[in-house]
Amino acid sequence: MDNKLEKMKELVEELNQYAYEYYVLDNPSISDKEYDLKYDELVILEKKTEVTLPYSPTQRVGDKILGEFSKYTHKGRLWSLDKAQNMEQLIEWHNRNLKVIEQYNSMSEDKLPELRYIVTKKFDGLTVNCTYDENGILIKSATRGTGIIGEDITAQIKTIKTVPLKIKNNHVIEVHGEAIMTKTAFEEYNKAAQVPLKNLRNGAAGALRNLDIKETARRNLSAFFYDVGYNEGPEFKSYREMMNFIKNMGLPQDKYIKECTNMEEVEKEIEYIESIRGELDYDIDGAVIVVDDIKTREILGYTIKFPKWAIAYKFEAKEITTKLLDVEWNVGRSGRVTPTALLEPVELGGVTVKRATLNNMDDIKRKNVKLGAKVLVRRSNDVIPEIMGVVEESLEESEEIQAPDRCPYCNSHLVQNGVHYYCENTLSCKPQMVKSIVHFASREAMNIAGFSEKTAEQLFEKLDIKSIADLYKIKKEELLTLEKFKDKKSQNLIDAIQNSKNCDLASFIYALGIPNVGKKTANDLVMKFKTLESIKNTTIEQLVEVPDVGEIVAKSIYDFFEDEKIISNIEELLNLGVKPYYEEERIDENPFMGKTIVVTGSLNNYSRGEIKDKLQSLGAKVSSSVSKNTDYVLVGEKPGSKYEKAIELGVKVINEEEFSNKIK
């Protein structure tokens, strides 16, 4: 048995070395036939001994389907990078670095060296983190996730032949890299694929987030490594030293690494990378510039999101030319009428683009966009389609885009306000009315259960509902005439509408649909002014005293309650029995009074609504997102990304038991 194990270890070491020579160095020392013979010998020995070494090349073969992804907490954080879109922004970043270094050197005897940068390509794939233990064995691979917690993709990463399963290292490290799909692998995969892939990035991301390991293996991914994020061994003094370590460990690394001492050199390297972008066998979307000296990095430090010693230079988004066929005008809940470009379908970055946003008529005129013209379409940040301009030669046979003077839905005359057009027919314009009703009935507003957009459309079309107040005039017999409304459903909706009449004032304010006013602002208004009458009669000067209310929001609120139609509708709601209330309770001193609290996960003793009410009764502000202004994050079972964000920002985290003890 011992002899067989020794032979297995010998074969594994040999085969891994041959794989490194073949896939990473592109310089094989044995033939494919010789490799296959040794591989087959190893497979036979593994079957006989029923032992498989964790770094055996046979572990690369995907032959199973996993049940689910598990979470993995990174030992070292995977930071995002700040971005520069042009050289001016890059120079500003450089000057900030210079200033910090000059200040440090003026006060310290231990001087920092002259700034030196390392420039590399920015790969457009999926960031991965590989953990090697003290024996050099790959024990875990994970996605970046939040930067603190990712998803375990160890089995998927093992299908990447360039990633070593064992390295010659005797301390725990985490190595960061980018998993990519080459153009060659992409084309080969699509030749036989029933559903062809549209782009390289999705090909890589989809492979690593696929529970079918065979499918992952079929995509034949590659990887480049560029950072040691966690290291229990000797510290590195420079990024160059770190990159040499990565290379010496046999991890695949891009050959392009350039050292620069000033911004002129950096700019030349960026121009070079962009010039070869189309020639590469993989996608890149920019360049990465990092400070070489590790001590200088430590002095420069970090923001909440980014290291200050590194930045990504983003290339211009990909553009393509297509024809503008038409412009569609849509009406929102506020009555604003906005244009959308309808395009001749075109492939851009692996996505079929048919529509693009045109912000307003000023934007259309500024870009000289015309019907029938060839337009330049860009997917900003490779995601959102945007018209950047026109091909001048195509304008001869084009037509001017005319701003509508009537609403495309109700034919009412439009009113221009600034750069936007508005339909003021709030009562009879279907899109406005339907969206307003849906908003009014939503859970955060009047909480009318069983209400949907389809129901709102039927109420508008069949029952002639032309105002929010009309909801409270509906009769059960009328609902029975609607599609899919039987006796029980009709009665349930009538009951839900009637039950909504007794509502808290903050929900009522939110339900009114005041522009720029969300639920939090509605709560803040009520806390400040106490009554509906006070809110209606407040001034802009008083409104800006409310937390997080600036002049724009204050003017929106003020103008809203100056509208006679709106005041009339509110009066009608009150006359129909809607009774918004506000109960100001005397709150005893407690640890949560005046604190901002975020809740995440499932609690044993409270529903989400109950814990929100409980916290507010304690005088706390309940927020939906974690920020540096958050005082506590209350964590239940199966917490989400808010918990991770709290850890990242150093926000105090408490569980349900701790919460209960604090309020006893």
Swiss-Prot record:
DNA ligase that catalyzes the formation of phosphodiester linkages between 5'-phosphoryl and 3'-hydroxyl groups in double-stranded DNA using NAD as a coenzyme and as the energy source for the reaction. It is essential for DNA replication and repair of damaged DNA. It catalyses: NAD(+) + (deoxyribonucleotide)n-3'-hydroxyl + 5'-phospho-(deoxyribonucleotide)m = (deoxyribonucleotide)n+m + AMP + beta-nicotinamide D-nucleotide. Its EC number is 6.5.1.2. The keyword Nucleus does not apply. This is DNA ligase. It comes from Clostridium botulinum (strain Kyoto / Type A2). Residues 587-664 form the BRCT domain. The lineage of its organism: Bacteria, Bacillati, Bacillota, Clostridia, Eubacteriales. Keywords: DNA damage, DNA repair, DNA replication, Ligase, Magnesium, Manganese, Metal-binding, NAD, Zinc.
